[in-house]
């Protein structure tokens, strides 16, 4: 049999289309002057520096230190909106612009107190000191070689002595060569080769 159509199963008519609405343009952020951007960056860096200095001092209570760390995170975030950063700066530091002006005045006064005076030795030529001249000071490490007692540069050169080849000849032609250590004559012939194996 036939199924009865209920209100639910009846297709709804399509909605009446009126005039086609144009999409509303997204509000573009107002163009910000380059000077204002630079000023904001300076203020932002100053505030981050002040908060970081306070945090690094270690004198803050735990709750205040946590809030300061959160504020630094917001200020250094690249995704946080500009308005949020300004709010955090105002809440954390109060009138930060006035504080910046005071600090700038202090630094300006300090920079005025610095004086540069020319040195009197500026006309004097510089000189180079060789290392060999410094070695005579005695501060450098030296071996314990005997040093000549007299200055050899002031003495006349001594004549070269004639070479006498007979001075190289041993005094006794029949004596065997000996080292400079003593061996008892009775033990010199007591060498035992019993432990040596001379197989070829």
UniProtKB/Swiss-Prot annotation:
InterPro entries: DUF4615
Chain spans, region Disordered: 1-28, 139-174
Residues passing through the membrane, by range: none
Leader sequence residues: none
PANTHER family assigned to the protein according to its UniProt record, in alphabetical order: UPF0488 PROTEIN C8ORF33 (PTHR13602:SF2)
Protein family membership: Belongs to the UPF0488 family.
Designated name of the protein: UPF0488 protein CG14286
Organism: Drosophila melanogaster
């Amino acid at each position: 049999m036939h199924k009865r159509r209920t209100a639910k199963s009846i297709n709804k008519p399509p909605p009446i289309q009126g005039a086609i609405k144009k999409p509303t343009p997204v509000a573009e952020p107002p163009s910000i002057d380059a000077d204002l951007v630079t000023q904001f960056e300076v203020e932002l860096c100053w505030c981050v520096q002040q908060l970081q200095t306070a945090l690094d001092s270690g004198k803050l209570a735990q709750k205040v230190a946590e809030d300061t760390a959160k504020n630094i995170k917001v200020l250094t975030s690249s995704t946080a909106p500009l308005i949020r950063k300004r709010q955090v700066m105002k809440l954390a530091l109060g009138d930060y612009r006035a504080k910046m002006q005071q600090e700038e005045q202090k630094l300006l006064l300090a920079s005025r107190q610095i004086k540069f005076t020319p040195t009197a030795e500026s006309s004097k030529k510089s000189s180079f000191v060789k290392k060999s001249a410094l070695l005579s000071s005695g501060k450098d490490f030296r071996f314990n070689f005997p040093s000549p007692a007299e200055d050899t540069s002031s003495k006349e050169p001594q004549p070269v002595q004639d070479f006498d080849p007979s001075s190289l000849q041993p005094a006794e032609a029949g004596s065997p060569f000996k080292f400079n250590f003593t061996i008892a004559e009775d033990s010199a012939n007591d060498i035992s080769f019993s432990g040596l194996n001379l197989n070829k």
